[in-house]
Amino acid sequence: MSKSTAEIRQAFLDFFHSKGHQVVASSSLVPHNDPTLLFTNAGMNQFKDVFLGLDKRNYSRATTSQRCVRAGGKHNDLENVGYTARHHTFFEMLGNFSFGDYFKHDAIQFAWELLTSEKWFALPKERLWVTVYESDDEAYEIWEKEVGIPRERIIRIGDNKGAPYASDNFWQMGDTGPCGPCTEIFYDHGDHIWGGPPGSPEEDGDRYIEIWNIVFMQFNRQADGTMEPLPKPSVDTGMGLERIAAVLQHVNSNYDIDLFRTLIQAVAKVTGATDLSNKSLRVIADHIRSCAFLIADGVMPSNENRGYVLRRIIRRAVRHGNMLGAKETFFYKLVGPLIDVMGSAGEDLKRQQAQVEQVLKTEEEQFARTLERGLALLDEELAKLSGDTLDGETAFRLYDTYGFPVDLTADVCRERNIKVDEAGFEAAMEEQRRRAREASGFGADYNAMIRVDSASEFKGYDHLELNGKVTALFVDGKAVDAINAGQEAVVVLDQTPFYAESGGQVGDKGELKGANFSFVVEDTQKYGQAIGHIGKLAAGSLKVGDAVQADVDEARRARIRLNHSATHLMHAALRQVLGTHVSQKGSLVNDKVLRFDFSHNEAMKPEEIRAVEDLVNAQIRRNLPIETNIMDLEAAKAKGAMALFGEKYDERVRVLSMGDFSTELCGGTHASRTGDIGLFRIISESGTAAGVRRIEAVTGEGAITTVHADSDRLSEVAHLLKGDSNNLADKVRSVLERTRQLEKELQQLKEQAAAQESANLSSKAIDVNGVKLLVSELSGVEPKMLRTMVDDLKNQLGSTIIVLATVAEGKVSLIAGVSKDVTDRVKAGELIGMVAQQVGGKGGGRPDMAQAGGTDAAALPAALASVKGWVSAKLQ
């Protein structure tokens, strides 16, 4: 009996655990502190800093089953998903890693044992082929002489991508840095399937499938292209869980493994589909995995960056559900079946099931309102298409008006062998893309420019001033030996009281000083295990090795501590008031305000905001002790400590407790007791994305300042209304009621004036071929009164055509009315369009009534004068 996908995942982890590897949990799909990556797309992402020497772990061997998404940027598999056997937006990457521990011999032997041993995967050895980099004789000999693979099944792959070391079998992290050859293991499905061995002209067939890639990081590539051997070579491997499951379950397509069969059946059930071979079922089964796990990891549907990729995937799934005949929202109903089939890998998702389902349901409901109309428009455009390419302007209109991502439009077109003019679409999108780039958080990361080999010891929990030694200096990202007055730089110390930005808390400010120099610190950031003080040398000179006195801005730190502690209290209060679905999605803690983003699907009611505020202030009055304990990560979680979104934790963690009210993992700085906070006030609550709310609040002196400001505003209003705070509400109600009465009277007067104006105008109508034509520019008439006037004039004139215009603040307002007995010859929409075009505008409407606007008031007289000739031609 073949293993289930869940059993295969566990067997992989168990095997490497038996070989001395630390089993490390999958990291978030949102890469931690790596703005160059849209999503986590490989097992090694969470170990990138370890491979670069910027981070150290208390283990040298690791194994993971890493959740990955490839649906944007360089790795964009979206358009192929559902149409091929192995493309997915979401997949799990099984991996084993050596950080300067074992190398080629053990890596290859481990892989061979797991794949072929009867105790483990028991694959037939004769079905396995391997590739090695052309010049990697060491790996070749291990495969041939130690493992015993015949030479004809070991293939050397050279530089096949047009440049030195540009090869399928040579891996590199970037233009410079760690790199090395790799060996890949392929499984031969048999000659009943078309395809040739790797490196052959038929290698793209489905017979020989890559199941494992083992990378040997043994070089450090320099800027000039030279390769220097690494002092401690490392290993990074990746094996797609879905691919190895297909092999072990004796199927050729990933969509035929047990996991996908179960999901496809669930999709069929919620959509009412009966043909289980329908590709739309495969699309939806894939997409629920990426969408659910992305939301669980904090990504919310939006129109930019990660959120837009998520929205594209959701809408593609909804459209395929529509093709299957789904009559109601269905996508969110697949979260439960997904949790069931993912086994232990779905535990994080299960904890957030309600939130994930609500976000998916809301997004589907929003898109469903425009899906039918958008598809109808697309069908209409495709029906009248003469060539084989849909113009970019139509694709943009579908995106802009109906929310169709361009790849969804391309999906529909591809089914009819029609291409989309993507260049035209991009041209139409240029302005939006420019704005998105400006708002984007993706770009050059100053932190990534600096590599610090040394480590800094943080002593800021107990000290605000400390003597330290300069271990490194950086100017414009480059290491220097000394800096002079006026230069901006990053200063690294061996020990420091300065807190580096982390966990939402901003970095400290202050001063580094000595007898002959002063360095003003404007920010503090982490660089691997080092802490960098960013600022400017105000006086003197500073060099590596100098002793400094590090002084943190004490007053600023104190305000930050209060805000950070209040954030923890508010988080716990939100969970009590709104429910345990509340989890942190982001935060900012500085010396002026605290900002907290959290999962919740609707705006908070005023009474809920008040309840949270009251609950936090109650804990402040209790004056609870704020205590920290260092413990193992798993023990902390077992204790109920909440982990914060987007943070990376070591095996030993700092647990912060506030009496019996709040327990969280936190490395930030805090007050000693909750009473130190003094007062807590919420100043705003708003939405930032679907399913995410944001609260801004102040504490201590900042909160008192807002109380005074509110009191001052009330006093000013009371003075203006000639009242006092005791009867202020009654005074406001009285003023509002009087205002409403006056507005009503004013409207009645306007309507009377318009009726009188209509009566005066009717006498100015002229006869054109038996139809009364009235064209007039009015002054002092509000644009919104034009429709009422046209209705009155129609009643007075009988068979008639009316065009009225008015100008207000330089803008032209136009309206055309045509009596129904004339609309077979003259249509109001065409008439108003002709006039509007002449005044720099556009408009439209029904055959009997149409409105438009324009910007060229000077052209209005000529435009109105043209109406008689145009109408005469139509009535002949």
Swiss-Prot record:
Coiled coil: none annotated. GO terms for biological process: alanyl-tRNA aminoacylation; negative regulation of DNA-templated transcription. It comes from the Bacteria. It is an enzyme of class 6 (ligase). It is found in: Cytoplasm. GO terms for molecular function: alanine-tRNA ligase activity; aminoacyl-tRNA deacylase activity; ATP binding; tRNA binding; zinc ion binding. One of its GO terms (cellular component) is cytosol. The modification N6-acetyllysine is found at K74. Belongs to the class-II aminoacyl-tRNA synthetase family. Consists of three domains; the N-terminal catalytic domain, the editing domain and the C-terminal C-Ala domain. The editing domain removes incorrectly charged amino acids, while the C-Ala domain, along with tRNA(Ala), serves as a bridge to cooperatively bring together the editing and aminoacylation centers thus stimulating deacylation of misacylated tRNAs. Catalyzes the attachment of alanine to tRNA(Ala) in a two-step reaction: alanine is first activated by ATP to form Ala-AMP and then transferred to the acceptor end of tRNA(Ala). Also edits incorrectly charged Ser-tRNA(Ala) and Gly-tRNA(Ala) via its editing domain. This is Alanine--tRNA ligase. It comes from Escherichia coli O157:H7. The lineage of its organism: Bacteria, Pseudomonadati, Pseudomonadota, Gammaproteobacteria, Enterobacterales.
